[in-house]
Regions:
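Sec-dependent N-terminal signal peptides of Gram-positive bacterial secreted proteins and lipoproteins
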Residues: 2-32
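Sequence signature of WD/YWTD-type beta-propeller architectures
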Residues: 25-405
Length: 405
């Protein structure tokens, strides 16, 4: 469920405080390639020294682009702006279901402000809107919210219909036949993922403790309990599944992996704040928060499915949040918050094809302070468009949609 946009600052402060308890474990000497949009079109950039900084810290580095790679660089083609709204879902490459927020009554010292919410459908290209008659699958009679996750081969979908903030009914739908099977048992968490093409893994959660891990057969809806022997995981900080493996973070922020039938997990990465598995299951984007003597901030790194570091440091700042893969796994969006104005700050895109990082701040930020997304990123079906919502002093919220080419 979405949270109030004003909670971002509170969450950010809490995240920084929590990060002070973590310990550093990363190696030194990695490089970061950041593309300056103004000069990337010409193929020339400043080449800075890649030598590690004193004390073993990674040094953020801009490298020169070979001429033959210029035509493969990711660039921004166009931007769009939707006032007072957030994206609920993409109905197609050009249409989005949005929720518009209107302040009805200002808050006082004793009363919370009151808002009015309306749903509509907007064409990104024309800006024209129409009434939402239930498209997008976000709401169904008797439920507050409906979420759907498609299997890797597109044959099935796992559907969660939330009765309220805490309890959901679960279903598996055969997208070829249209048959829907209800899965036994309530759940209290949204966390899960496709283990393979026809098996869904659900971290059901519980009002006390971590709850069950359920292995669900998409073909017949059969549920099998998955055993995990890990005393350090009273709750799951993060949870996901891919390519026959189940990934999660324990109470000590260690990313671990195990396979159904093997109850003992293997530790992969320490100091993990969040992680996202790419849709093609090839990579894991990991946001770490480390501390060694003094607060060292957050770093974004890419690992393969086995937990081996792949390539360079992708991002660095005081806090990295909302990491999100495009549907085709070609791009990774993330937001960086940094107090130091000379560091990375704002929304960035990592292009997996070129290995470059593209800053987007110039396309949505007019000046200081740097605005940051208040809800998770939203990708179009093709991955060629990215939507994100910011606080706005005039319209409460504003959603930007960036077109890539």
């Amino acid at each position: 469920m979405k949270q109030n946009a004003g909670m971002y600052g509170i969450k950010l402060f809490a995240a920084v405080l929590l990060s002070l308890a973590l310990t550093a474990c990363q190696s030194s000497g990695d490089r970061l390639t950041v593309v300056n949009p103004d000069v990337s079109r010409t193929g020339t950039q400043t080449d800075q020294s890649p030598d590690p900084a004193p004390g073993g810290e990674r040094k953020l580095t801009v490298v020169k682009t070979p001429e033959q790679q210029v035509d493969r660089e990711l660039t921004v083609a166009r931007t769009h702006r939707i006032e007072a709204a957030s994206i609920q879902s993409w109905l197609s490459e050009d249409e989005v279901s949005i929720e518009t927020t209107k302040l009805v009554k200002a808050g006082t010292a004793t009363e919370e402000p009151k808002y009015e919410y309306t749903s509509s459908i907007v064409n990104i290209n024309t800006g024209q809107s129409r009434k939402n008659t239930g498209e997008g699958g976000q709401q169904v009679k008797g439920y507050m919210l409906v979420k759907e996750t498609i299997s890797p081969d597109g044959s099935y979908s796992f559907i969660q219909k939330w009765k309220d903030k805490y309890i959901a009914d679960n279903f598996v739908k055969n997208l070829q036949t249209g048959q829907t099977i209800q899965i036994k048992g309530d759940n209290y968490l949204e966390r899960g993922g496709w283990l393979n093409a026809d098996t869904y893994i659900l971290a059901a959660g519980s009002m006390s403790g971590r709850g069950e891990i359920r292995q669900i057969s998409a073909a017949d809806g059969k549920v099998t309990a998955v055993t995990l022997d890990d005393p350090d995981a009273e709750m799951f900080g993060q949870f996901g599944a891919s390519h026959g493996r189940i990934y999660y973070t324990d109470d000590q922020h260690v990313l671990k992996v195990f396979e159904p039938g093997q109850a003992k997990p293997v530790s992969l990465i320490q100091d993990v704040w969040s992680f996202e598995i790419s849709p093609d299951s090839q990579y894991i984007a990991v946001s770490t928060v480390t501390q060694s003597g003094e607060f060292k901030g957050s770093k974004l790194l890419i690992y393969d499915a086995a937990g081996s570091l792949q390539g360079s440091l992708i991002g660095k700042g005081d806090l990295i949040s909302y990491i999100s893969w495009s549907p085709d796994s070609a791009k990774l969006a993330f937001d960086v918050y940094t107090e130091d104005k000379t560091g990375m700050n704002g929304v960035y895109i990592f292009d997996t094809r070129s290995g470059r990082v593209l800053p987007l701040a110039q396309y949505y930020a007019a000046g200081d302070p740097m605005p940051h997304p208040v809800y998770p990123f939203s990708w179009s079906p093709s991955g060629n468009r990215l939507g994100f919502t910011l606080d706005d002093p005039k319209s409460l919220l504003v959603t930007h949609v960036i077109d890539f080419k």
